[in-house]
């Protein structure tokens, strides 16, 4: 299975180096996961938006150097949506990117939303803690989700 996130970058943090780091972080989500009870090889990538990219599959990521526009000031992405804003100074290469990209893929948080702290019963997955492990919960949620990503069976 191939998961592609066609993405347009903007913001003061959208330097060539930060865009490359973002793409590397997304590519690092690739691996073998349990999808629907079957071990499945999954490749995850960021692609450029081209004229042929369906509008519904186009994502916009704003990279900022400091607090985001969210009331908390933290990185965020629309759940199953097309837009996200990431603070490149906050754990940018330590899990924030896979966490927020998983939101775009339709996967919700597992941590305690009241405290913002990881839920010990929910393990070390990227949707419970950052940094965390990209696991079958996150990848399976993207594969099975209905969001602004392009999925292709190989």
Task: List PLM regions with ranges.
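Structural recognition of the beta-strand scaffold that forms the well-ordered cores
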Residues: 1-6, 103-104, 125-128
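Metalloprotease/metallohydrolase-associated module, dominated by Zn2+-dependent proteases
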Residues: 79-92, 111-154
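Active-site-proximal beta-strand/loop segments in catalytic clefts of secreted hydrolases
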Residues: 6-8, 64-66, 107, 129-131
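Zn2+-dependent metallopeptidase catalytic core
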Residues: 2-47
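Catalytic zinc-binding patch centered on the HExxH motif and its immediate surroundings
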Residues: 52-88, 116-121
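Extended Gly/Ser/Thr-rich low-complexity repeat segments
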Residues: 15-27, 70-78, 140
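Catalytic glutamate of the conserved HExxH
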Residues: 96, 100-108
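Short pre-active-site segment immediately N-terminal to the catalytic Zn-binding motif
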Residues: 10-18, 77-98
